[in-house]
UniProtKB/Swiss-Prot annotation:
The gene is mnmG. NAD-binding protein involved in the addition of a carboxymethylaminomethyl (cmnm) group at the wobble position (U34) of certain tRNAs, forming tRNA-cmnm(5)s(2)U34. InterPro entries: FAD/NAD-bd_sf, GIDA_C_N, MnmG, MnmG-rel, MnmG-rel_CS, MnmG_C, MnmG_C_subdom, MnmG_C_subdom_sf. It is found in: Cytoplasm. FAD binds at G13, G14, G15, H16, A17, G18, V125, S180, Q370. Disulfide bonds: none annotated. This is tRNA uridine 5-carboxymethylaminomethyl modification enzyme MnmG. It comes from Thioalkalivibrio sulfidiphilus (strain HL-EbGR7). The keyword Flavoprotein applies. GO terms for biological process: tRNA methylation; tRNA wobble uridine modification.
Length: 639
């Protein structure tokens, strides 16, 4: 008999989903094996060198609050930080960092290699070991057998991956890496619903060949935001600027003249591409009225001259890529170091997943990342953390965990996927969350770190830092409520300048801070008001808590109303045809989706409020009143 070894959890893939899955599993106490086809590519940024953005930054903060790695790696590798939507309300503000690819990957690798209970092995996986109706391990390309009752697949674009550059195409998982053909075929045998998606990347440019005098500089923010709740600015490497270029009508004419050579328009690519990150061909066709598109010039790192021209992702032939790049002002002498390409790959309908991200087709098998139809490092990492955690919990016979929609963007992401599915690469936006005022970046730790601590994900150092911050916020809020300003005892003119109006009666500082025009730092400058807190993150929490208290309370009341029936479990084998009053359309949709809870049923397109009421009555009559799954504080998962 050949080689065989056993682990509690096996994670296949070392990208953003895989590393978070393996780390979460190991932190939760499971003896975890991370299998990757190449250890040198662990944590690699396969597409653009950036972390965060609108909606995505919220996911990164939540991963961090649960003890994950992405935010810390972004702080250690980030060379350009910005807060997006900084002039808008706190619900939609988002952190984004350009990362040095080498430094980011090194930060990930360092943590992975130094995490207890986590083991690495370099080998591609070709098959699953299946015993009855559950997974029992994996078989590698050389026949090595690794056994485990829980396997997490985080295989990115590698399943049946095919790379396209113009009329030329070849098998590949990404540039320079082979695809997973045997594993893709095996999964197609097991999973009932499979499709093809597509993504792409732009040509890379030697920055020395660009005329920056024709571009617009985009410096980072000062002061810089910090991604991790336990991060600091002194961790950041030296900072650099990004730049903005623009395509021209000549650029668009070149593209239109070569569309017949594009695999997207010739029919060579069957996969659907990301709606919110279209190729330059798509932009020119879909937005024919626009005579110019922005191109963001993003540095790849401090020790390389390569730049990433974000905005001209393309699968056009290389000669066309060369011509269109040189038609952009400032790029007349540009030297392309790597061609752009499109890649299409298999994904599996996420409606065939449980909220834990365990598949319905095979017990113990979990999916995370692009295999579930998502796009983006952040979406992948969030799924990886949940899948890895639940894989570890499953082998200890603990209840699975998934945050609700009102608890986290991670909950919104997973609920959207398993309830609605997706026919195109799914990207997170703040607009997808109905409770976004409660789900801000700044309070992700307050929302999730206690839960992470209960489940063993949060270490002592992070927990101590969290408790210190939480106590400081509570202490300062109480101080502001107890401190009163008397108009007779302060500089009236200075006070009215700070509060933006007349100051004629005694008020406490918390009430004054609730006024939209009042700034915390300015308020603390008034005689008798300070000194305030020095930590800007504590000050931000205090100010947002004061200003939005009424709105947040209303949203919490709405959540409470929804929660009365949101988590009501629907029996696994519920016969929708037997429920009197449901239309044929609703019965078909419920049978196709098989929702886990009444809340999920209500979010299926075409399921009416009346149908939800009928479902509720039916389940109540059958004696159903339990939640979808126990919370992690049910006493069985203490750290």
């Amino acid at each position: 008999m050949g080689f065989e070894a056993s682990y509690d959890v096996i994670v296949v893939g070392g990208g953003h989903a895989g590393t978070e899955a393996a780390l979460a599993s190991a932190r939760a106490g499971a003896r975890t094996l991370l299998l990757t086809h190449n250890i040198e590519t662990i944590g690699q940024m396969s597409c653009n060198p950036a972390i965060g953005g609108i909606g995505k930054g919220h996911l990164v903060k939540e991963i961090d609050a649960l003890g994950g790695l992405m935010a810390r790696a972004a702080d250690r590798g980030g060379i350009h930080f910005r807060t997006l939507n900084s002039r808008k309300g706190p619900a939609v503000r988002a952190t984004r960092a350009q990362a040095d690819r080498v430094r980011y990957k090194a930060a990930v690798r360092s943590v992975v290699e130094n995490t207890p209970h986590l083991f690495l092995f370099q080998q591609a996986v070709d098959d699953l070991i299946v015993e009855g109706e559950r997974v029992a391990g994996v078989i590698t390309q050389t026949g090595l057998r690794f056994r485990s009752p829980a396997v997490v697949l985080t295989v990115g674009t590698f399943l049946g991956g095919r790379i396209h550059v113009g009329e030329v195409q070849h098998a590949g998982g990404r540039a320079g890496d082979p695809p997973s053909i045997a594993l893709a075929a095996r999964l197609r045998e097991l999973a009932p619903r499979v499709g093809r998606l597509k993504t792409g990347t732009p040509p890379r440019i030697d920055g020395r060949s660009i005329d920056y005098a024709q571009l617009t500089e985009q410096p980072g923010d000062a002061p810089r935001p910090v991604f991790s709740f336990i991060g600091a600015r002194d961790e950041h490497p030296p900072q650099v600027s990004c730049w903005i270029a623009r395509t021209t009508e000549h650029t668009h004419a070149i593209i239109r003249g070569a569309l017949h050579r594009s695999p997207m328009y010739s029919g060579a690519i069957e996969g659907v591409g990301p709606r919110y990150c279209p190729s330059i061909e798509d932009k020119v066709v879909r937005f024919a009225d626009k005579d110019s598109h922005q191109v963001f010039i993003e540095p790849e790192g401090l020790d390389t001259h390569e730049v990433y021209p974000n905005g001209i992702s393309t699968s056009l032939p290389f000669d066309v890529q060369f011509e269109l790049v040189r038609s952009i002002p400032g790029f007349e002498q540009a030297h392309i170091t790597r061609p752009g390409y499109a890649i299409e790959y298999d994904y599996f309908d996420p409606r065939d997943l449980k909220p834990s991200l365990e598949t319905r087709c095979l017990a113990g098998l979990f999916f995370a990342g692009q295999i579930n139809g998502t796009t983006g490092y952040e979406e992948a990492a969030a799924q990886g953390l949940v899948a890895g955690l639940n894989a570890a919990r499953s082998v200890r016979d603990l209840a699975p965990w998934c945050p609700r929609r009102d608890e986290a963007y991670i909950g919104v992401l997973i609920d959207d996927l398993i309830t609605r599915g997706t026919a195109e690469p799914y990207r997170m936006f703040t607009s997808r969350a109905e409770y976004r005022l409660m789900l801000r970046e700044d309070n992700a730790d307050l929302r999730l770190t206690p839960l992470g601590r209960d489940m063993g994900l949060v270490d002592d150092a992070r927990w101590a830092a969290f408790c210190t911050k939480r106590e400081a916020v509570e202490r300062e809020t109480q101080r502001l409520a107890a401190t009163r300003l008397d108009p007779e005892r302060v500089d009236r003119e200075a006070a009215e300048r700070v509060i933006g109006g007349a100051f004629s009666r005694e008020q406490n500082l918390l009430d004054l801070l609730r006024r939209p025009e009042v700034d915390y730092a300015a308020l603390m400058g008034l005689e008798g008001a300070g000194p305030g807190v020095e930590d800007p993150r504590v000050a931000e929490q205090v100010e947002i808590g004061a200003k939005y208290a009424g709105y947040i309370q209303r949203q919490q009341d709405e959540v409470a109303r929804q929660q009365r029936h949101e988590n009501l479990a629907l029996p696994e084998g519920l016969d929708y045809a037997a429920i009197t009053g449901l239309s044929m359309e609703v019965r078909q949709k419920l049978a196709a989706h098989r929702p886990h809870t009444l809340g999920q049923a209500a979010r299926i397109p075409g399921v009416t409020p009346a149908a939800v009421s009928l479902l509720l009555v039916h389940v109540k009559r059958q004696g159903g009143n339990g939640p979808q799954s126990p919370r992690p504080d049910d006493g069985r998962a203490r750290a």
